[in-house]
Amino acid sequence: GLLENTYNLRLSNASEQTLYLQADVSGFDHIELTGLPKTLEIPAGDIVNIPVQVATYPEYATKGSHPIEFQFRYHTEENQEWRSINENSNFIGE
């Protein structure tokens, strides 16, 4: 089976328009992010807390802490150009 870690993403939209956001994760082979829709809508001025899971096969996440990176792409209705921001975290292997 897969090894999973759970993360609570706190996403804030400080703009005056709805934000459209997509997320992914990287750090090692065969890692995937689950628990989010393909595109998430965050209303203007809103903050959402979303639990997500990051999963991989145990052979890729040996015992200990492994650096991973969440990648977020977003745009607003007015500005259709995708922008991005990355956040570092850790995946705990067994």
Spans of model-derived segments:
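Transition segment at domain starts
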Residues: G1-Y7, S89-E94
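Short edge beta-strand/loop segments characteristic of extracellular beta-sandwich folds
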Residues: T6-S12, Q53-A55
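Intrinsically disordered, low-complexity Pro/Gly/Ser/Thr-rich segments with frequent PxxP/GP/PP motifs
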Residues: I31-E59
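Short, solvent-exposed loop/turn segments enriched in Ser/Thr/Gly
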Residues: L2-Y7, V48-N49, K63-I68
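Short aromatic-acidic-glycine turn motif
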Residues: G27-P37, E77-E81
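Terminal connector regions
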Residues: T56-E94
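Short acidic, flexible loop segments centered on an aromatic residue
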Residues: E16-H30
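Asparagine-centered strand-capping/turn motif at beta-strand->loop junctions
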Residues: R10-S15, Y74
